[in-house]
């Protein structure tokens, strides 16, 4: 048995081809800062150079309060995280102190905090860091700012600490966006 195309089949095929012709790869969308608080927005004249997702732990240590030496509290001691690209491939690490971002290619940098802003209950704050010049050539060369966004977790434990020197690790996740000058 032989089947023959009908006029409706021809119209469907023409419409399908026309639709396929309109589907083009769209250019990569620039990271938008519109939803971020003004203090942690990167100044104009910069563009996104690298986007990573950091997952790891924040370590807190029980230390004497500055204004009450007979009392103790949780104090930020440092981060340790794996940095992955948007496809899930490990591309670096983040650790401290001092806060250090290190790419898999060996380039690394430190920075100075410029601003923070609340990122919701139970989450570390948004953060804007001014990068120091990178050590070693690679992905981090020329980075001017690092932005911490899309935060999940990482705040100090809710249970009070009881003994100086006690440590606790809290898991967190954040996007680290690296910006270079235009």
Regions flagged by a language model, labelled:
Residues 2-13:
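Bacterial N-terminal signal peptides that target proteins for export
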Residues 7-9, 29, 45:
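Intrinsically disordered, low-complexity segments enriched in proline/serine/threonine
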Residues 23-30:
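Sec/Tat signal peptide C-region and signal peptidase I cleavage site
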């Amino acid at each position: 048995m032989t089947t023959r195309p009908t006029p409706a089949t021809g119209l469907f095929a023409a419409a399908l081809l026309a639709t396929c012709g309109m589907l083009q790869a769209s250019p990569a969308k620039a990271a938008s800062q519109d939803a971020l608080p003004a203090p942690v927005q990167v100044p104009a004249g910069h563009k996104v150079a690298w986007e990573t997702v950091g997952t790891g732990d924040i370590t807190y240590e029980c230390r004497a309060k500055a204004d009450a030496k007979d009392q103790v509290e949780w104090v930020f001691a440092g981060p340790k995280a794996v940095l992955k690209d948007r496809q899930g491939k490990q591309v670096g690490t983040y650790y401290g102190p001092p806060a250090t971002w290190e790419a898999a290619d060996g380039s690394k940098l430190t920075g100075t905090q410029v601003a923070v802003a609340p990122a919701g209950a139970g989450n570390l704050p948004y953060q804007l860091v001014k990068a120091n010049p990178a050590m070693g050539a690679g992905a981090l060369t020329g980075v001017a700012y690092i932005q911490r966004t899309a935060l999940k977790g990482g705040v100090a434990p809710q249970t009070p600490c009881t003994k100086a020197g006690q440590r606790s690790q809290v898991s967190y996740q954040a996007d680290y966006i690296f910006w270079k000058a235009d």
